[in-house]
Every structure is written in C-alpha cells, then in structure tokens.
C-alpha cells in the first residue's frame, strides 16, 4: 500500500528500529519467531548491552522462538502470544546463524497459521538480503510491514546508506511520523 525509501534511513537496523519504535509502546511485547536476530537487533531490543533509547528501556519486552528443522515453529509462536504481544518479527536471512534462509513459502505458511488465531497481530519481516530473489515479496503473502537496507541487495553494495519500510499505509504513516 505504501513505502518509505530513504537515504536518511541510515541502514536496515535503523529501519527496523524506526518500525518497532513506531508500533510498540510501553508494556507491549515483541516475539522473534525465526530464532535469534542479528546482534545489532539485540542491541535495539535491549537484549545486548544497555544503549540509550533501546526498546527494553522503553518498556517493551522481548521473547524469541528458535526455528524447528530450519522452519518457523508457528505452533510454539501461537502458544507464546499473550495479551501483551503486539508484533511478531521474522528474519528472512540467516544472519550469523548456520542455517538456510527462510523461503517465502515457509514464511507464508507460518503467517497463515498465525493469522487463523491472531488476525490482528502485527507481522514484520526483516527482508535484508531477501529482496528481488523471488517473484513476490513478504508483503504479498500477508506480512504487515517489510523492512530492509538499501545498502545490500537493492543498492548492490554501491549505496553508502539507506533503508526502506513497505507495507500497510497506516503502519507506514506511523513510521513516517517517527522519521520526520
């Protein structure tokens, strides 16, 4: 429905922080359902170090669910959701883990199963390194918001900075307000 594509979004991590901080408030919970995210995301979430302005400092709690046989364990994800859970986070790439990247087929299956029980929960896909490798993108299979870096696939390693956020218009409007 809408997107922000900006060189002023310094990186993929910056785009992810903007997204999470725009959608999550004190008392909310985020669950990473594709295992441990990048180290930089752990800093953003307040799980590594104590950088000022991290989400834990803002009262956002965090849980993570490991992959099961290199796939999203959607059954465990559904069981872990509480009244506080506002957003489920999926990291498509391997990050620093030794595992295959998540395919859109696997992500779609998880989103469909989760939406059967929790139709209104936000689902965010960290799409860094995932752009342009399949005919569709995560927003085509039910993700509310897709986030990535312009430095990696879109920028071909040539762009020095930049990030993007694409998804539902009301979400992008909230993120744009946070950015400007």
Predicted regions located by residue number:
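Short glycine-rich or small-residue beta-strand-to-loop segments that form or flank ligand, phosphate
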Residues: 4-8
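Conserved PLP-enzyme active-site core in the AAT-like
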Residues: 10-180
């Amino acid at each position: 429905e809408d997107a922000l594509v900006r060189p002023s979004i310094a990186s993929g991590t910056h785009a992810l922080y903007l997204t999470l901080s725009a959608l999550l408030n004190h008392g909310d919970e985020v669950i990473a359902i594709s295992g441990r995210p990048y180290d930089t995301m752990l800093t953003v979430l307040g799980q590594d170090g104590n950088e000022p302005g991290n989400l834990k400092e803002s009262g956002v709690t965090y849980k993570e669910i490991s992959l099961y046989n290199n796939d999203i364990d959607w059954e465990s994800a559904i069981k872990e959701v509480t009244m506080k859970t506002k957003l489920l986070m999926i990291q498509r790439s391997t990050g620093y883990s030794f595992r295959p990247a998540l395919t859109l087929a696997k992500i779609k299956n998880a989103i469909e199963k989760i939406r059967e029980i929790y139709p209104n929960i936000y689902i965010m896909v960290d799409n860094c390194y995932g752009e342009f490798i399949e005919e569709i993108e995560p927003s085509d299979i039910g993700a509310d918001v897709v986030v990535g870096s312009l430095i990696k696939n879109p920028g071909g390693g040539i762009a020095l900075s930049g990030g993007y956020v694409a998804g539902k218009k009301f979400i992008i409007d909230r993120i744009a307000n946070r950015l400007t």
